[in-house]
Every structure is written in C-alpha cells, then in structure tokens.
Amino acid sequence: MNDLFLTNYTDETFLSRLKQCFKRCVSFSLSVSFIKKAGLILFEREMEEALKRGVKGRIITSTYQNFTDIESLRTFNEWQRKYSNFECHLDHVCFGDNGYHSKGYLFEYDDSLEIIVGSTNITRFALKKNIEWNISLVSKESIDSYNGAMNNFEFLWERTFDLNEDRIKQYSILLDYAIEKWDMDYVNPMSQRVVPNSMQRKALKELRRYRDTGVSRALI
C-alpha cells in the first residue's frame, strides 16, 4: 500500500493528483460538501474526458450552508443528460441537523483502488491557495479504509436526492432569500473595509456600554 500527504504546496499537489486520478480511473465516487464552479473548472476537462471514455462517475454534494453554487449543479445536470454513466445526488437537509460536511474522493483503477480524504472541498481557494491537508491511500488489494468509505457512500447515496432541474430551481429560490450567502471564490481582496458612520459609531458605543453593565437586550 502506498500513501501520500497532499497539500497545495507539496511536490505533488492535491489538484495535480486529482487530475491524474481522473485520467487513470475506471470509476469514481465523490462525496464533497461544497462545490463551486470556480473550483470545478480547474479539473472539469479531466473529469469530463473520463466520462467520455465510459468511466462510471457518481457525485454527492450538498446545499449545506448554502455554499454549493447553482453553476456547478447545472454542469452536473447537463452531464447527466449527456452521459448515461454519470449520476449526481444532492443532500438538501436529508440528515436533519447533521450538516453534510464530507470531503472524500474514491477511485477504482484497472489494478488498484485509491481513497483521498481530508479537508479540501471543490473551490478555487481550497484547490489553489488554502492550507489544506489530505491523505491518499493506494492499494492493489481491498483495504478497510476504502471499503468503509464506499459502504458509507452507498448509505449516503440511498438517502440523498437525485439531482434534477426542479431541485436546482428550488435551491436557486432558496439562495435568493438566504440570509447567509458567502462566496470565498469571488470575494474581492481589494474591496474596501466596511466602516461605520458617525451615527452607527454612537450606537455601537452605547451597545458596548450596555454589555459592560450586564444588559443583554437593547433597542437601537
């Protein structure tokens, strides 16, 4: 069994490894909580080339924290129409209060198996810049870690929704009304810091004074 530690700064990066996996695999199963088009596009070509070769591909992603974007889901839905060997499932509060937060990449090759697990979601920052840790295990024989992950993948697959146009529309409406919507991949690092005006500064000062005296509620 071979093992690798993968980051954005190791000799072989997580992204470069992922691209090689798609070039060699005969099947892949991905369970990734957060997927952004700006991240997906970094290896989209390799992934679609695998599907064109007839590789069986499955992905589970999630609406958890409203992070996955509509563009990625539309890409996956288009692939489902184009390739009978590709399927995508969507977690939308399928597990109640248990947030869907996995990052697992399973690949089957002609002569071996590979599992990559760690912290990396499919976002541009996660794949190019962030400090991320991932472990890859490759074995020519069946190993407990791969089997356990695949069993859990099947469990999750049976309890999540088929991705379709109606679910994408429902999620799009949810995003339009969402209170929390933050997209690191598109944050402008040069954007100006928000500074309170004079009236807001006075209100914040009064709130601090109330907190200091033990008051927990106030009207502004």
Question: What function would you assign to each model-found segment?
Answer:
Residues 1-209:
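PLD/PLD-like phosphodiesterase catalytic module centered on the HKD motif
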Residues 212-220:
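Walker A/P-loop
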